[in-house]
Amino acid sequence: MTSIISLSSVLGSQAPRLTALPPLSLYIHLPWCVKKCPYCDFNSHEPHNGNIPEDDYVAALIRDLENALPQIWGRKIVSIFFGGGTPSLFSARSIDTILTAARTLLPMEHLPEITLEANPGTVEAKKFSDFRSAGINRLSLGIQSFNSRHLKALGRIHDGDESHHAVEIAQRNFDNVNLDLMYALPEQTLTESLEDIQHACTLGVSHISAYHLTLEPNTLFHRYPPSLPDDDLAAEMQIMIEQTLASRGYTNYETSAFSQPALESRHNLNYWLFGDYLGIGAGAHSKISFSEKIVRQMRYKQPKEYLAQSALDTPLQDQHEVGRDERGFEFMMNALRLTAGFASEMFQQRTGLPITAIQQQLNEAEQRGLIGRDHLRVTPTPVGRRFLNDLLQIFLPDKKQL
């Protein structure tokens, strides 16, 4: 295997510099949910005694945003995403308060995409209408399945009928709706996974995300693993999902993302193209670029601690610069998830590094049939997309196993 070129040998002691800053998104984390799912490794928490300190948390978010302004001064927001947890547990009044503050404090691109995640078990028609009035223009529903037996196995609080009903209500209020679905579920058959994806297609939503269930560390499923489809069956499910969605007019523009024409997730595309994002709220992550450095941040994870630290104007638990030996891998780890890959010039625009810094790795990936490239673009091949971990491992700074 070809050895990695040391970036210090390419650049000497000169620090890489960005000549232009990438697009900037805003991520807002609302960490509470009705019930923690056994497969979930996100920063989500069941409220103590069922009570969410909603007003205090909204005030903390706005304070957090105000304190972050010097890092992003003058930069326009291209998208906003309310993630969780279950953001739809919050009132439309609170969402409106947060968005009003964001619009007051930050310049916005014309008609930014503003997404809110919702759980089918917390769907109310009036509430969705009020979310739209507050400024939400894209809804992401955590359906996971339309099969009640599988939903019960996943520990979800809704059943198949509620999944269908939630989509109907969402579509009455929003033109842009994403459904999160999962496959390779406990005891799931190929036919059952096909039924889920076909049902989603008949609803005609603008976007579908299809995720392979994985047993993440620090989850109940990791401690007590359920019986899951084997790798061969899971691969059959993935191929069948891709073929079914393609036949219904959806473009598989990213590993797990499928959209109707021109309705890709703008927020997630910014992530995948190594754009910037300011994350506020408990456990939220940020990536912020400056001309001479790229910084990653994480807010305090526990809601109670985040509230206390935000009141002291110290919400950051961790902050570090992305080393120049890490920038190439971080860019490729995201951009190679995209079916269309990336424009070659974007590598230098987003990392500050010449693309020659990863020339040997590109050569190796091409020789192994994992990417195709010309002087304009680098694109993962179908083989590279299917064996993405093998492709990404080529670009690891020290060749750690993924």
Model regions and ranges:
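N-proximal helix/coil linker or "cap" segments that precede and/or mark the start of modular domains
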Residues: 1-7
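C-terminal scaffold of the Radical SAM
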Residues: 9, 13-16, 21-25, 43-71, ...
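Local cysteine-cluster metal-coordination motifs and their immediate loop/turn environment
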Residues: 29-44
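Pocket-edge structural micro-motifs
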Residues: 30, 280-282, 382
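Short amphipathic alpha-helical interaction segments
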Residues: 352-364
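A short, conserved structural fragment
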Residues: 367-376
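Minor-groove-contacting beta-hairpin "wing" of winged helix-turn-helix DNA-binding domains
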Residues: 377-381
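Short, amphipathic alpha-helical interaction segments positioned at domain boundaries
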Residues: 383-402
